[in-house]
Amino acid sequence: MSTLTRSPAWLALSAHQTEIANRPLRTLFDEDPQRFDKFSLQFKDLLLDYSKQPVDATTIRLLLALAEQQKLVDWLGRMANGEKINFTESRAALHIALRANSPVFMDGVDVTQEVRRVLRQIEQFVQKIHNQSHRGYSGLPITDVVNIGIGGSDLGPVMVTEALKPYHLPQLRTHFVSNLDGAHLSDTLQHINPATTLFVIASKTFTTQETLANAHSARKWFLAGGGSKQDIAAHFVAVSTNREAVSQFGIDPDNMFEFWDWVGGRYSLWSAIGLPIALAVGMEHFHSLLAGAQAMDDHFLTAPFEQNLPVILGLIGIWQINFFHITSQAILPYDQSMHRFPAYLQQLEMESNGKRVTRNGEAVDYSTGIIIWGEPGTNGQHAFYQLLHQGTQKFTADFLAPCRCHHPLSEHHPMLLANFFAQTEALMRGKTEQEVRSELANQNLSADLVEHLLPHRVFPGNHATTSILFKKLDPATLGMLIALYEHKVFVQSVIWEINPFDQWGVELGKQLAGKILAELALDKPVTGHDASTNGLINFYRAQQ
């Protein structure tokens, strides 16, 4: 057993789980009519309801004791004070500085000065695009923005841009290209004009294979479509830390928007990586997005843990993953504009906490991270909810929804939210054999048919969910939501004693792909891999 799993706080939670696991959720609600009031929290217009989780007052007390044992307070301070807590890369993790309204220091230097400088650069550029003083090579204004990036240079910006569609400025269309599959770029290029298109090449190192392949193809298309090399300056900008590589590509370094090595990719949408967001919705709304995140930062760093939304959300996840052995979490936004939110959280959670060794390099003997997936409601109800209600796989789920909608079809929203509320209740309560029998008896069915149908109509229930409601999905609220999950991930990493800010797991496949790419051009059978990989490569080559 590791130090963590034999610690007093961990052992106390293990013993408590044995007891509370025998108390179904519907029983917990039946026993305590005030359960919602006791196990829900509100911050500004954001409501977090965790009363449908298998917790009682003892659970929360023991989880908070675990947080104290793991020195969560100290780690919050270390992050906020710019310590190099990403120790495998010798970097700080200061994404909170990107939205801070007061100085944040690293190595004695207030990094927010540089943040503000780049924000001013972004604002000036966005203004030129919007007022059409920045024009394409033919003199026409820019009508389309194509962001080329992958991972953190794509998932955050595309998620936010989609979520804030009601705030889009009408004169610009925003597109995102990430996949190395040429179809992604090719399909996008079919709908735009080289003379009125701006490409944003987003890569921290400016060496990412997928991004550079797409960027070079986009440049080739641009030059073939009437633009010259001199015109690239008006149509290509870069978001990067590598000025030399940007210049070698042909982009004017003055058109490079900088960010810093203390900004992790999956935490970078608040930085210059968010340029396409600012272009889509304008700087006022981009600043509101930052302000919402900053408000959640302040709450996270100052609120008592028992009233702290990210802390409670993170600890509930620990409770489910490590003591109920849940490996799957559905993210279910009942808002179509949030359709990319599950994919965004996949990277945030799985790339951050998908680690197998502690900060000290010791193999863990407990689960870390969870498989994140999801789909907007009510689409998911007609796809995978069957398994959630009557299947055999264990899971937990977060339901998210706005109380008010942006679109004019307002009569749809009560129906949507009725489904939201119904699903969380149905997953929790289920339907007992007695309830099904009574229901069938009222349908004038024969006794034999009732017995035949009975087992198929029973819902076991007792499925844990967390609900997050908010007034309306505006930029500030979205900023709060994203920061809520960012900090939740950090809380869990502290409990698990892992580094959530590196991602060495993405490297091995990239290294092998480089070797295999050269082999695909050989004129002889490939034999240097295992039999399966050799067979796959040789089959591919035979089809060319």
UniProtKB/Swiss-Prot annotation:
It is found in: Cytoplasm. It catalyses: alpha-D-glucose 6-phosphate = beta-D-fructose 6-phosphate. It comes from the Bacteria. Pathway: Carbohydrate biosynthesis; gluconeogenesis; Carbohydrate degradation; glycolysis; D-glyceraldehyde 3-phosphate and glycerone phosphate from D-glucose: step 2/4. One of its GO terms (biological process) is glycolytic process. Signal peptide: none annotated. The keyword Cytoplasm applies. Pfam families: PGI. Belongs to the GPI family. This is Glucose-6-phosphate isomerase. It comes from Nitrosomonas europaea (strain ATCC 19718 / CIP 103999 / KCTC 2705 / NBRC 14298).
